[in-house]
Amino acid sequence: MAWELIQISSGHKSLENFKLEADNIPAVLHQLKDHFQGRLETGNKIGVEILSSLAAEILIDGIKLTVGWDNWSGLFILAWDADGDNLVQEIEKFINA
């Protein structure tokens, strides 16, 4: 998988893979669950906008991330704060290994 770590307009980190589609989200969530095991929890929000975006909130060590897909970024893992930035960087190290 060709994951790219970028800084988005909010100043936070996002891992993006333009080659993956929305139907790859379950496989990525499974990969995250395998890696983080008991540290990963599901969040409260899941959203779908037909044909243009899909997203799910997850928590790892209580830190909120969004795993989603849209027609601009492809599949992404998005941070919401500085703790999330560090976590996205941790994910990038194992997901690109």
Residue ranges and their predicted role:
Residues 42-66:
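Amphipathic, interaction-prone secondary-structure segments
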Residues 57-97:
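Short, compact, well-ordered microdomains
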Residues 12-14, 53-55, 74-75:
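A generic structural signal for beta-strand entry/edge sites
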Residues 1-49:
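Negatively charged, low-complexity tracts enriched in Asp/Glu with abundant Ser/Thr
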